[in-house]
Amino acid sequence: IVYASIKGFGSSGPYSAFKSFEPVAQAMGGSMSVTGFPDNPPTVTWSCVGDSGTGMHCVIGILAALMQRNTSGEGQQVEVSMQDAVVNLVRVSLRDHQRYGKPVERNGNQLGSFVPANTYRCHPGGANDYVFIIAQQQMWEPLLRVIERADLIGDVRYQTAEARVEHADEVNAFIEEWTVKRAKHEAMQILAEAGVPCGACQDTSEVLNDPHLRARGMILDLDHPTRGSYTIAGNPIKLSASNV
């Protein structure tokens, strides 16, 4: 028999009897400490990395145990703790701690030392009217052309990744001068067509009505005999020979 169990802190160790919820797992797994802005408190992400992340780790463990049973003929218990799962998802920050020898600080939406790699305001300035843009070295010149700043191509202040880090405030400012005049999906379309990785910050309503997600069957409208019509998230895993 292969069987699985999930606990907040597992069945062994000093915290094994402690109760846990999603935010508790994020706090104890290190996720909260690296989420949010530098001058604000540690922040919970409501992407459910503790709940859903633990479940996905558990499924992987079950599949591994089933594969092993095929060769050994023996079953076993699969155990995943919520704290362990969050720690695994925070492994990049743990790596950075080893690299720099100190706790990783909250950095808002800035992605590491990439510049640009941040959120930029868009028209008309609503709570979620932002687009996230990241451009590595080979994307820098196309980005400048798109935002109508070809005059900066070759400018030594921004020519290398290291130089852009030193002038990050200036870079972010002239990118936002362009994005703030455009709706987030318009900005995303223009940038994406130029090969610049980007994404509009979509609220839940926009996600539910996203034409791409609907085309892929990720957002589905269902009819229930007693509840009526409602919308759900579909299956993110696509199998070529199975309709799941």
Give a label for each model feature.
Residues A192-L213:
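Conserved PLP cofactor-binding pocket of PLP-dependent enzymes
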Residues C58-A65, S93, P142-V146, F174, ...:
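Alpha-helical scaffold segments in soluble metabolic enzymes
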Residues Q159, D223-V244:
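Flexible, small-/acidic-enriched active-site or ligand-binding loops
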Residues A85, Q138, Q202-S205:
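Alpha-helix/helix-capping structural signal
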Residues H97-E105, D210-H224:
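Short, surface-exposed loop/helix-turn segments at secondary-structure junctions
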Residues I1-A135:
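Active-site-adjacent "lid/gating" segments in soluble enzymes
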Residues S16-A17, R164-A168, D210-R214:
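Short secondary-structure transition/capping segments
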Residues P116-A194, C198, N243:
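Aromatic-enriched alpha-helical interface/lid elements that frame and gate functional surfaces
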